[in-house]
Amino acid sequence: GFKDLLKGAAKALVKTVLF
């Protein structure tokens, strides 16, 4: 669903920012 896609994008963004 859209929520899952948003979750994935948020995770990737956090990973990029932190690491």
Swiss-Prot record:
Keywords tagged on the record: Amidation, Amphibian defense peptide, Antibiotic, Antimicrobial, Cytolysis, Hemolysis, Secreted
Entry's Gene Ontology BP terms: defense response to Gram-negative bacterium; defense response to Gram-positive bacterium; hemolysis in another organism
Signal peptide: none
Tissue-level expression: Expressed by the skin glands.
Keyword Acyltransferase: no
Primary role: Antimicrobial peptide that shows similar potency against Gram-negative bacteria and Gram-positive bacteria. Has a high hemolytic activity.
Protein name: Ascaphin-8
